[in-house]
Amino acid sequence: MKIGVFDSGVGGFSVLKSLLKAQLFDEIIYYGDSARVPYGTKDPTTIKQFGLEALDFFKPHQIKLLIVACNTASALALEEMQKHSKIPIVGVIEPSILAIKQQVKEKNAPILVLGTKATIQSNAYDNALKQQGYLNVSHLATSLFVPLIEESILEGELLETCMRYYFTPLKILPEVIILGCTHFPLIAQKIEGYFMEHFALSTPPLLIHSGDAIVEYLQQKYALKKNAHAFPKVEFHASGDVIWLEKQAKEWLKL
């Protein structure tokens, strides 16, 4: 089966990595809207329009399934995209919520949602978690992580300063952190390390990210078998510099 993966830039690599490892599909078309990244600072109307334009991009590729590997687009554009599509379109928020249900049984466990400004303001995660009975949910817009990751700044003083800026004011220490932006798993170890070091935690917080969650979701929803195919063929496209995108993919995905 040929599928599409859509993200604002390189963040979707975290989803793509999980898909490649699972080998659920034999061909993947990856489209990064790198000319207009980040999405997280844009207004909802603009994000919906970007989503519809991504649909137009995929039409000639004759894919059978589209994964919106962007939390902001999943929160604000997914429904509109589904209305205009004849193929199934899957976002990353629902799979993450299902992963929480499976892994977090304590409804009062403190959960922290990290995301872009647009994702957090949409309340998509907060509302979905409350519907599942989780009562102790807080959120934090950490949009500055996105341009750092797009520039391959995955460690060092600048990232440390950014984490200190966002995390120092926290009053409730989370047991669960939802990485509500597909860019964030690329710095997951740094986030975990920061909490362990600066908050003197005895055990690391549980990190939930949509890459692993979506594999499980797709297996269940579409009865797909893991490792049923040879290593998938991947084709990269971008609204910006596709050569740069391919270079980043080779570095991060070891292609």
Swiss-Prot record:
User: GO:BP terms for this protein?
Assistant: cell wall organization; peptidoglycan biosynthetic process; regulation of cell shape
Enzymatic class: isomerase
Pathway as given in its UniProt record: Cell wall biogenesis; peptidoglycan biosynthesis
* Reactions catalysed according to its record: L-glutamate = D-glutamate
GO molecular function terms listed in the Swiss-Prot or TrEMBL record: glutamate racemase activity
User: Which positions are tagged coiled coil?
Assistant: none
Q: State the EC number(s).
A: 5.1.1.3
Q: Does the keyword Cell wall biogenesis/degradation apply?
A: yes
Pfam families per the UniProt record, alphabetical: Asp_Glu_race (PF01177)
Q: Which HAMAP family match?
A: Glu_racemase
The family note in this entry says: Belongs to the aspartate/glutamate racemases family.
Q: What is the annotated role of this protein in its UniProt record?
A: Provides the (R)-glutamate required for cell wall biosynthesis.
What protein is this chain from? Glutamate racemase
Protein species of origin: Helicobacter pylori (strain G27)
Give the organism's phylogenetic lineage: Bacteria, Pseudomonadati, Campylobacterota, Epsilonproteobacteria, Campylobacterales
